[in-house]
Amino acid sequence: MIKILIVNMILLITQQLSAKDYDVRDFGAVGDGIFVNSNIIQHAIDYINAAGGGRLVFYPGTYVTGSFYLKSNVTLHIEQGATLLGSTNPWDYVKDPHVGWKSMIFAVKQDNIGISGKGIINGRGFTTANNMVKYIQKGLFDDPLKLDRPNETNRPENIYFRECNNVVIRDITLKDPASWNQTYDQCKNLLVDNIFVDSKSYWNNDGIDVVDCDGVVIKNSYFDTADDAICFKSHDANAICQNVVVDNCTGRSSANGLKFGTASRGGFRNFKITNLTIYDTFRSAITFAAVDGGLIENIVVDGLRSVNTGNVLFLRIGNRWSSGKTPSLQNVTIKNVYAEVPYAKPDAGYNYEGPVEDNPRNISPASIIGLPNMRIKNITLENIEMVYPGRSDTLYAKVGLTSKELDAIPEMEKSYPEFSQFKELPAWGMYIRHADDIHFKNVTFRALEQDYRPAVVMDDVKGASFRGVSFSEPNAQGKNQIFKYKSSGINIE
């Protein structure tokens, strides 16, 4: 799968490099940071498309624009020193009727398109969103202002591509959207390579959203985001996000580093994630959320370094919007991981940092949590070291190991999935519930200070193996670090 994807992407890049160049200024564009160029850019794209294709080149300057549509066989090439600057007038953006979102750059049902160059796409999202709030308050725009902000579909993204084939996004900087930064929805053959994403200007600022796509490579890229950094979604129960490679990427988030979900109607299949670095992240380094009736299967994570991140791994089956379908999460291998979980809030001081919780909990463990009739199956954790702070305080929060306490942990099957949703959990390293065939190989759990909880708690687990698993905790000689409850087929070597 990976070799085929890479060959296809090389062919796409070669095709783009051989395209004819057109200077956007020859069509009347003005890069003075004032003139709004939307209509001129659209005319240039239409012309190049009709002429058989080519590159629309933006030379150094600041080109203000609202919405426009990229078309087949056209690449936007933004030179170093050039900026596509989003208009701060919300009326300069359209909501596409097929997509249902606003964006600066749209493409719908187009082939052989791309964005390249060392330049910048800057949505100026904070100002644009606040201007929209003013229009809403004047009654000029219809929006309920839920949570005191416009709905995310009414705020412009930087990029939204829907049902496009052969897409290349290379070398650019994407910053300051008013909503999600870039979405690729039901696209085939997508390459994202060597991009820099700064997405901390407003709420819901995901770094990249890949929705129900087939054949995706994301590599050599950096994401600094207020919301999920790298996010895979499945909006269509009859579609699936599949055949995806993520390699050599770095993420920083006030939500999750890399996430499957939350929208998970169809599901996710055949992913390989390698050499991923996550730091200063509020929630989980990687979240797997099968909560809307879809599947998550055949996933390999090989190489994760997670530092100053609130949680390492969160694997969850829920029953939120399943509509009669049964979600599944199975056949996941996670290996070659080093992770440090801090005691303090990891994203303190960042723009739009994660919320301060109003219910107390000690540091949460990594977790694998299914439901009694929807079990997580066949998970392998190999060559992993997880370092926790310890320091749990029973006066702050406590869940012990009695039947009454363990049974009182809620299922929360309809709740939004988040590693901290259960509040206090009875383990400091790993909590596993309603799962089958969970395998640990060469895994180290390390607590820097003493914790009242054992490292691992299994509740209703059928089949688990521990090979080469070690525990380090001060003043814990003789402590039973693996606790089994209502579990069977547990092999500890």
Where on the chain are the PLM-derived regions?
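Extracellular/periplasmic carbohydrate-active domains that bind, remodel
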Residues: L11-L12, Q16-E493
